[in-house]
Amino acid sequence: MSEEERPAALADTILRFLCHDDIDTVKELCADWFPIEYPDSWYRDITSNKKFFSLAATYNGQIVGMIVAEIKGRTKVHKEDGDILASSFSGDTQVAYILSLGVVKEFRKQGIGSLLLESLKSHISSTAQDHCKALYLHVLTTNSNAIRFYENRHFHQHHYLPYYYSIRGVLQDAYTYVLYLNGGHPPWTVMDYLQHLGSALAGFSPCTLPQRIYRQAHTLLRSLLPWSSISAKSGIEYSRTM
């Protein structure tokens, strides 16, 4: 889509990283967007600590959206999401966790959330290269708008987490959503193994395997015995009876 076709807000949006001076604004936005209360240390970290990817979308100098994420080794993933990647991936394989993604109400449905998410994915590709295999997040089961947003961008529900959040003293359920990148995948299920086995067996004709075994045994026997006139006729008959 060209600049002329974009909504005015998106065309005039400028991206920049959060800084310490943004703390008060970010606090106000998070209080409006999310029902969860974050400690002051969290705001200091996401605006100052370089381990976080904290990107703001600004319009006329005002923050109208932001995304906060952390790229980390798979061994640092919390226990409830420890099976996001199959165990075949090494311990230094990376994943990216979205801590926060929000847009001011008046600027929603104009592509700003997608712009922020795509910027994170581009950052992952340029810094972690192909070592980052998954991008994941948590979302309230009741947040249908957020769920729709992520599902429309190819995220898939990975876990149901009962009583995951405590909101104003009330325990509420969450989902884990995952987008796999660079060949990443979850552990195989029993159905995956059965499908793989079925695909492998589909490549064999009913007699292929017995014929292979016979030919190998026949070759070995000829190399061991003093005579080499063993007929292959029985092998042909064997294949016909299968």
Swiss-Prot record:
Required for homodimerization, as annotated region: 162-173
Intramembrane feature ranges: 193-236
GO molecular function: histone H4 acetyltransferase activity; protein homodimerization activity; protein N-terminal-methionine acetyltransferase activity; protein-N-terminal amino-acid acetyltransferase activity
Top class in the EC scheme: transferase
InterPro entries (alphabetical): Acyl_CoA_acyltransferase, GNAT_dom, NAA60-like
Residues forming the catalytic site: 97, 138
Main location: Golgi
EC number: 2.3.1.259, 2.3.1.48
Pfam families linked: Acetyltransf_1
Recorded catalytic activity of this chain's protein: N-terminal L-methionyl-[transmembrane protein] + acetyl-CoA = N-terminal N(alpha)-acetyl-L-methionyl-[transmembrane protein] + CoA + H(+); L-lysyl-[protein] + acetyl-CoA = N(6)-acetyl-L-lysyl-[protein] + CoA + H(+)
Topological domain ranges for the Cytoplasmic compartment: 1-192, 237-242
GO process terms (BP): cell population proliferation; chromosome segregation; N-terminal peptidyl-methionine acetylation; N-terminal protein amino acid acetylation; nucleosome assembly
GO CC annotations on file: Golgi membrane
Subcellular location: Golgi apparatus membrane
Main function: N-alpha-acetyltransferase that specifically mediates the acetylation of N-terminal residues of the transmembrane proteins, with a strong preference for N-termini facing the cytosol. Displays N-terminal acetyltransferase activity towards a range of N-terminal sequences including those starting with Met-Lys, Met-Val, Met-Ala and Met-Met. Required for normal chromosomal segregation during anaphase. May also show histone acetyltransferase activity; such results are however unclear in vivo and would require additional experimental evidences.
Family under the similarity heading: Belongs to the acetyltransferase family. NAA60 subfamily.
Subunit structure: Monomer and homodimer; monomer in presence of substrate and homodimer in its absence.
Protein name as catalogued: N-alpha-acetyltransferase 60
